[in-house]
């Protein structure tokens, strides 16, 4: 490899690393208005099916999510609006806690995300890894390919099957985090341990929605 090519690759890698530091970490895209967790929560509110939301939290946290969801149904007028918001905040907070992350409120729509996170969602939506070309280091590419395959295989599932939905979410989270450069990102198990599947979506879990 020529010195010029080596320098070019080094600069490119450095720019990608800087982008990850300047923009918010991949795990944070789950606490934005545009992210997959809020989108799943809104699907639950619109459809009346709380399972869309439950896929994003541990089984141990289901009761708290169900209680917040029930409060929405019981609310009227302004009370309903407030209950909607509390439900979404409860959902995101518990999802974040399941990943060992803190929660300081849902970030506004349009909050910048690392390019690899946006591209990972786009790749899953289109069924092609092309959007991620040039955003992932060569030594991590095979790992991305494997995680993409797992997330793609699990994204279509019966919404009534929570273990399957949580497996999809786990696979999704693992894929996106890894694509963004976060370690081996075995979040799936860590996040939705009960699902043992690695974690999310898609269907709803997607985050395609997501993201």
Model-derived features with residue positions:
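Long, charge-rich, low-complexity intrinsically disordered regions
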Residues: 3-28
């Amino acid at each position: 490899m020529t010195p010029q090519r080596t320098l070019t690759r080094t600069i490119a890698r450095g720019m990608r690393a800087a982008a990850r530091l300047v923009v918010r970490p991949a795990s944070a895209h789950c606490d934005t208005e545009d992210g997959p967790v809020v989108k799943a929560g809104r699907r639950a509110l619109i459809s009346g099916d709380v399972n869309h939301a439950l896929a994003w939290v541990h089984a141990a946290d289901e009761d708290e999510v169900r209680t917040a969801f029930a409060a929405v149904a019981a609310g009227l007028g302004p009370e309903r609006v407030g209950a909607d918001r509390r439900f979404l905040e409860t959902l995101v907070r518990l999802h974040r806690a399941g990943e060992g992350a803190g929660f300081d409120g849902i970030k506004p729509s349009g909050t910048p995300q690392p390019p690899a996170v946006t591209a990972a969602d786009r790749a899953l939506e289109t069924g092609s890894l092309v959007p991620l070309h040039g955003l992932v280091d060569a030594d991590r590419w095979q790992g991305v390919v494997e995680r993409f395959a797992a997330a793609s295989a699990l994204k279509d599932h019966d919404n009534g099957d929570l273990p399957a939905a949580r497996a999809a979410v786990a696979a999704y989270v693992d894929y996106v985090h890894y694509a963004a450069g976060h370690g081996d990102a075995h979040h799936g198990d860590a996040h939705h341990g009960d699902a043992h599947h690695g974690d999310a979506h898609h269907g709803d879990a997607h985050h395609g929605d997501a993201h």
